[in-house]
């Protein structure tokens, strides 16, 4: 399989106003990024490079977020703000392709990651140069499961990875 453009698969971890570990928060995109992880894939889906940074948020990291991500306030304390990481991320993408506007972004659940990424750039008045198609990996996994006769409710990264024979390296709810 050969793509017509390069692919940047990325994930964000973010703050939340949810403090209680026992309940799940409502979906939010107005929080601050605390970690970005990305993999740059060429047109043949070959891994070219990875990018991972912790980000200092402008609001506290709650116990809920630490519980699900293992990211503590101390880990982000001395890290740069997104105003420094955003341009670094774009420069990293630019090193691997000729036209950043044509790069395809892909994330598990575009309804969260893409708006949060756009908001982070806008918050610091940074240009958002990524204008290509955004691929929702969760939607693709849901279609694959449905076409395979499997249930599509409670669809998580762990379930799909296991069904595809992918052994995770690291922890879920960490960006890379």
PLM segments and residue spans:
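A short acidic-Thr-Gly-centered motif at the start of a beta-strand
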Residues: 1-3
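Metal-dependent phosphoesterase core characteristic of DEDDh/y 3'-5' exonuclease domains
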Residues: 5-6, 29-36, 40-71, 91-176
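Short, hydrophobic/glycine-enriched beta-strand segments
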Residues: 7-11
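Short acidic, Gly/Ser-rich segments with clustered Asp/Glu that frequently serve as metal-coordination loops
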Residues: 12-24
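Short histidine-centered catalytic/ligand-binding loop motif
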Residues: 68-80
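Glycine-rich, highly charged phosphate/nucleotide-binding loops
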Residues: 77-91
């Amino acid at each position: 399989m050969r793509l017509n453009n390069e692919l940047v698969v990325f994930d964000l971890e973010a703050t939340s106003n949810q403090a209680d570990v026992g309940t799940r928060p409502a979906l939010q995109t107005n929080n601050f990024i605390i970690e970005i992880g990305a993999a740059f894939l060429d047109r043949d889906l070959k891994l070219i490079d990875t990018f991972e940074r912790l980000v200092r948020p402008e609001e506290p990291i709650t116990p809920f977020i630490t519980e699900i991500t293992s990211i503590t306030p101390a880990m982000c304390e001395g890290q740069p703000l997104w105003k420094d990481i955003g341009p670094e991320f774009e420069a990293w993408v630019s090193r691997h392709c000729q036209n950043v506007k044509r790069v395809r972004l892909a994330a598990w659940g575009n309804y969260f990651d893409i708006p949060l990424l756009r908001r982070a750039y806008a918050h610091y008045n940074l240009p958002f140069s990524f204008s290509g198609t955004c691929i929702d990996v969760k939607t693709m996994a849901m279609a694959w499961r449905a076409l395979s006769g499997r249930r599509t409710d409670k669809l998580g990264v762990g379930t799909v990875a296991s069904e595809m024979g992918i052994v995770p390296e690291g922890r879920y709810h960490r960006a890379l």
